Design a protein with these regions (language model features):
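Active-site PLP attachment segment
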Residues: 235-279
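N-terminal "arm"/small-domain region of PLP-dependent enzymes with the aminotransferase-like
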Residues: 2-88, 290, 296
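Walker B catalytic acidic pair
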Residues: 222
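Hydrophobic/aromatic beta-strand patches that form the interior of the parallel beta-sheet core
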Residues: 32, 102, 133, 155, ...
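Conserved core of the PLP fold type I
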Residues: 53, 58, 63-217, 225-239, ...
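Conserved PLP-binding catalytic core of the aspartate aminotransferase-like
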Residues: 316-365
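Short catalytic/ligand-binding loop motif for oxyanion handling, primarily in non-cytosolic enzymes
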Residues: 40-44, 194-195, 227, 260-261
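Structural signature of PLP-dependent enzymes
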Residues: 281-300, 306-335
Length: 365
């Protein structure tokens, strides 16, 4: 057939995953993958906590569970428990019925749904610049999500200071102070990717003060609640603080890391509003029907089962604490090894943050 394909002029897209493929093809015996995103056990593979494994087996053999589609917003019990996990059971937003949640296809799906909601309905009755501010650096996929959603201006606020190996607080505050009114600001409550450097509670108070003064809208990510500090409350403190101040908030949650459900794409989007909740909820439902119709059930059932049972919840929390402690011990061992080898450079930042990520400052050479 001589006819040309209608896709003949399609260029190759750049992909951050190409580095992983190159790594797999590299035959060097001493290669090291510094771009891993999963929590790995001692044998170098992802794993489940014993509790999660047990519950997955129970669900798989439960004769009362039948294959059926979930509601558009997912499993109601999962959404209720995920909301309480992020905001706390005594949250004023929950008590005042000012919040709704949507089970999503991973945290990526939560960010995409939130971006679609904001792009379509945020400040729809006023002149809006269409600006979203991301941290510099941040995961490249976040910028692509907002661009593909149609945001006119994807901008960045300064976050990482290579000289101090920590958060560049002065630059961050300056950039937010000068952001256009009603800009959306994407922030990490904990587990900042890719630096691992999180804001302290006092720093969060300053950021929240600027957002209130400048009419900025917080879109907050919680990628691994409980796995950064070992405390569910501490890792979600930023979201709870913003809600306590009366700010409207979108919050994207992931249950991949803290439950080990990497291949099951269990995410959740929280919407905390001051008013007009039912109308926004109806628009979210319409968007979900065009994005994935309804989410999968298995991983969400695991999460709902753990969070709704006090004994399971306590056991899961203990497992998270052990994982967080192990992450810190690995950091300390690496830091000590580099010190003993007299490796050039400053490695103190390895032991500063918690969680899975760390910015070690290596360049391409």
């Amino acid at each position: 057939m001589s006819a040309r394909s209608v896709f003949v002029d399609t260029p190759f897209a750049s992909s951050p995953m190409k580095f992983i493929e190159d790594y797999k093809l590299d035959a060097h015996p001493n290669k090291v993958n510094l771009a891993g995103r999963e929590y790995l056990a001692e044998h170098g593979q992802t794993t489940w906590l014993p509790l999660i494994r047990k519950i997955k087996q129970q669900i798989a053999t439960d004769p009362t569970l039948i294959p059926e589609y979930t509601p558009v917003f997912g499993i109601p019990e999962f959404s209720r428990r995920a909301t309480e996990l992020a905001l706390g059971t005594d949250s004023p937003a929950i008590l005042q019925s000012r919040v709704f949640g949507v089970q999503t296809v991973g945290c990526t799906g939560a960010v995409r749904l939130g971006a679609e909601l904001l792009r379509t309905w945020f400040c729809s009755g006023s002149s809006w610049s269409g600006s979203v501010f991301l941290s510099s650096p941040c995961d490249e996929s976040l910028a692509e999500i907002f661009k593909s959603t149609g945001f006119e201006h994807v901008r960045y606020y300064r976050y990482w200071d290579a000289k101090s190996s920590g958060v560049f607080m002065d630059g961050l505050l300056h950039d937010l102070e000068n952001a256009p009114d009603h800009s959306v600001v994407l922030l990490f409550a904990s587990g900042h990717s890719p630096t691992g450097a999180d804001l302290s509670q006092e720093e969060w108070k300053r950021v929240a003060e600027v957002m209130m003064k400048r009419n900025l809208f917080p879109f907050i990510l919680i990628p691994a609640q409980g796995l950064c500090s070992g405390s569910l409350e501490q890792d979600a403190w930023a979201v709870r603080h913003c809600v306590s101040l009366g700010l409207e908030v979108l919050c994207a949650q992931s249950f991949s890391h803290n439950f080990g459900l990497y291949g099951e794409r269990v995410g959740h989007l929280l919407c905390v509003l001051r008013q007009n909740l039912l109308a926004v909820q109806s628009q979210a439902e319409r968007l979900v029907q065009t994005l994935w119709s309804c989410p999968s059930v298995d991983g969400a059932r695991v999460v709902a089962t753990v969070l709704s049972n006090p004994a399971h919840l306590a056991e899961w929390q203990e497992g998270l604490k052990a994982m967080a402690v192990r992450c810190m011990l690995i950091r300390e061992r690496l830091h000590e090894r580099l010190r003993l080898l007299a490796s050039p450079g400053c490695w103190g930042n390895i032991i500063k943050p918690g969680g899975l990520y760390c910015c070690i400052g290596l360049n391409g050479d």
